């Protein structure tokens, strides 16, 4: 235990918390423009063609964002909204594209978990 005089000379320092989503700069979402839309393969033991986009954000950051759901309408120069949330089997992908916002369409014919994919409620 430190003495009072030691603490007066050298006060205790707060631990600096490191964020897992630095490009958001403490915001819930950020807007950006797609610079490249492509597919990539996940780490072992998984196998798929995961859809991702390279995005230049309004704050100048360039990040890789995962495009969830079946099918998408994104191409180069599409304006999208990204949120935090990594994809465990894609190294370097720390952001998700928000479906149904800006130029990103919602997932068509989605019945369950619709709010996560920007899908409207089906007619009866």
Curated annotation (Swiss-Prot):
<keyword id="KW-0820">tRNA-binding</keyword>
<dbReference type="GO" id="GO:0000049">
    <property type="term" value="F:tRNA binding"/>
</dbReference>
<dbReference type="InterPro" id="IPR012340">
    <property type="entry name" value="NA-bd_OB-fold"/>
</dbReference>
<feature type="modified residue" description="3-methylthioaspartic acid">
    <location>
        <position position="89"/>
    </location>
</feature>
<comment type="function">
    <text>Interacts with and stabilizes bases of the 16S rRNA that are involved in tRNA selection in the A site and with the mRNA backbone. Located at the interface of the 30S and 50S subunits, it traverses the body of the 30S subunit contacting proteins on the other side and probably holding the rRNA structure together. The combined cluster of proteins S8, S12 and S17 appears to hold together the shoulder and platform of the 30S subunit.</text>
</comment>
<dbReference type="GO" id="GO:0003735">
    <property type="term" value="F:structural constituent of ribosome"/>
</dbReference>
<feature type="region of interest" description="Disordered">
    <location>
        <begin position="104"/>
        <end position="124"/>
    </location>
</feature>
<comment type="function">
    <text>With S4 and S5 plays an important role in translational accuracy.</text>
</comment>
<dbReference type="GO" id="GO:0019843">
    <property type="term" value="F:rRNA binding"/>
</dbReference>
<dbReference type="Pfam" id="PF00164">
    <property type="entry name" value="Ribosom_S12_S23"/>
</dbReference>
<keyword id="KW-0687">Ribonucleoprotein</keyword>
<protein>
    <recommendedName>
        <fullName>Small ribosomal subunit protein uS12</fullName>
    </recommendedName>
</protein>
<feature type="region of interest" description="Disordered">
    <location>
        <begin position="1"/>
        <end position="20"/>
    </location>
</feature>
<keyword id="KW-0699">rRNA-binding</keyword>
<keyword id="KW-0689">Ribosomal protein</keyword>
<keyword id="KW-0694">RNA-binding</keyword>
<comment type="subunit">
    <text>Part of the 30S ribosomal subunit. Contacts proteins S8 and S17. May interact with IF1 in the 30S initiation complex.</text>
</comment>
<comment type="similarity">
    <text>Belongs to the universal ribosomal protein uS12 family.</text>
</comment>
<keyword id="KW-0488">Methylation</keyword>
<dbReference type="InterPro" id="IPR006032">
    <property type="entry name" value="Ribosomal_uS12"/>
</dbReference>
<feature type="compositionally biased region" description="Basic residues">
    <location>
        <begin position="109"/>
        <end position="124"/>
    </location>
</feature>
<dbReference type="GO" id="GO:0015935">
    <property type="term" value="C:small ribosomal subunit"/>
</dbReference>
<dbReference type="InterPro" id="IPR005679">
    <property type="entry name" value="Ribosomal_uS12_bac"/>
</dbReference>
<dbReference type="GO" id="GO:0006412">
    <property type="term" value="P:translation"/>
</dbReference>
